[in-house]
Amino acid sequence: MKRRLLDRVHDRAWRVVGECLSGRPQPSAALKSGGVASSISSELPWADVCGSFANGGLASDGFRRCSAVRDIVETVGPVDGRFYAGRIRDWGPEWLTNPVIARIDTWGGPIRWPGWLLGTPRAFSPTTLRYLATALWLKRNGYLSEGSEVIEIGVGFGGLAAMNAAISGAVTTVVDLPQVEMSALRMLNETGLGRHGRLSGEWNGSSVPLVISNYAVTELNATIQEHYFETYLKHAAHGIIISNSGVFASTIGGRTDDELIARFRAGGLDAGMETANDLLGPCDYLCGVGMIRW
């Protein structure tokens, strides 16, 4: 699949601007977190920056502009951002001017792209648009309703949990490295959505309507994947896992998509793979990313 020259230029401009505007915390602020190396992200500065933020060593202003954060969670470019903006216009255009969505988008001072280039009424972080489109997709497909509970594995800065709170009033149990969980809860509190999030240690192990994961489950080694299956996945009536196992499985000793699906089915989950649907964006297709769901 070849990309249009215009798309390549557009995303290249985003990368150049991002490199110029990204911030870097002072070394004294990036406290060592001591997290267990269980994933791709646990080995990167991202985990330490989240630990510092969770402990009050970093302010929220500029958090999403920090290079260590952008490398992990602000990865959606403007071409994909425009794709998700189109989905939002189809599924709920009023949300593009909603003040709660604006508060989530501007929290942490992310690099935002002009609305006329994204097809939105104002500037947005392209990553915000993906989270908003995902939350709308989950609701319109019946996975979440008002007040639903959801487990999110790999919570990032808390953006999707915040969107699910805004769109569906959902309560998210965040599952990640401890310092990342605490960082995400701080974000939810600062955006007025704190009652919609809880730490993984607060979950009682009961069944839940949905477990979701944007890439994170497929960026774990097989041992941790098995732990997450037994602890979380098998308790969910439905699951949505955006998978890039084709990129990471062999590198970190994780399962391939076929192996994951076989494990899920052996555990009683009617899981299948989709390589095309309304939520997978242009870069997902380009990189061979798919969706595992049951």
Labelled PLM ranges:
Residues 236-248:
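Conserved beta-strand signature within the Rossmann-like core of class I S-adenosyl-L-methionine
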Residues 186-206:
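S-adenosyl-L-methionine
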Residues 209-223:
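A short SAM/SAH-binding and catalytic strip from SAM-dependent methyltransferases
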Residues 146-156:
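Conserved class I S-adenosyl-L-methionine
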Residues 128-146:
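Conserved alpha-helix/loop element of class I SAM-dependent methyltransferases that forms part
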Residues 157-169:
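Conserved SAM-binding loop of SAM-dependent methyltransferases across substrates and taxa
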Residues 2-125:
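N-terminal accessory regions of S-adenosyl-L-methionine
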Residues 220-232:
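A short, conserved alpha-helix within the catalytic core of class I
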